[in-house]
Amino acid sequence: MNKGFDTLLEYSFIHIPGIKEKTEKKIWEMGILTWDDMQENILNPEIPVYNRDLVKSYIIGSKRALENVNIGFFRENFPKKEYWRIYPKFKERTLFLDVETNGLAKELNEITVIGTLYKGKFRSFINGINLHDVIPLIEDCLIIVTYNGNLFDIPYIERTFNIWKKNYISLDLRWIFKRLGYSGGLKSIEKQLGINRPDYLKDVNGYTAVLLWEKYQSRRLNALNVLRRYCLEDVKNLVFLLHIAYNRLCKELRFPQKIKPLSEKFKWEIKINCDFSIIDEIQMEVKN
């Protein structure tokens, strides 16, 4: 009956009206695991659904949306807390993103650097140089992954570029990890999971990023490269965290069949020439 799939999306029924978590699990326990299974067995009176025509139409719509890369269908119909299921199927159009700002009061606070990973390529976008070049990536992507981005990164991007992109899915890892029982900022979550940053970046935080931008503004050009490197470390670790979260949430579902786990190991190298001694300089200034 079941052909088997690498990702959880095609096993999901939770986006169909009338099917909640308990009902979805009952359906799985009956051996109805995929959209195809449901189509083939829709007349089975033991399947705990009430409107079979509605279920059938949603199965057909789901297949069509997947074939046509229509992320809007899944965005509108999946519960937000289940958006994580969608990621692997649209991985190639997923934008990992981190925003740094100048740290001023709200009306004066503006983006300084945006770091991204998209289609396997790390990039930096810098205020006063190429900041607006990030727009094509935002317009092309189908999923945006951030940490606390729903409250911070995305509002700043919308305000800065006057982009009100609606047809995408936002995966904010802060709330995904809260569901898994973790709390704290990005660096705190990394430490709790045993993700280690390079020694030269271990003591760098958001406040250091603000001071690096100030150094750059005072013509310390190396400070910009250090800031870019720090920002892209945030971006890189978003991928680790999302894959860890996906694998753990899959296990929590207790799905009857093993879902292929996402890789939690990467060998990325972020190539930016930096003199990290400026970090020690900043830390000494802060202490004094």
Report residues per predicted region.
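DEDD superfamily 3′-5′ metal-dependent exonuclease/proofreading module
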Residues: 1-110, 116-288
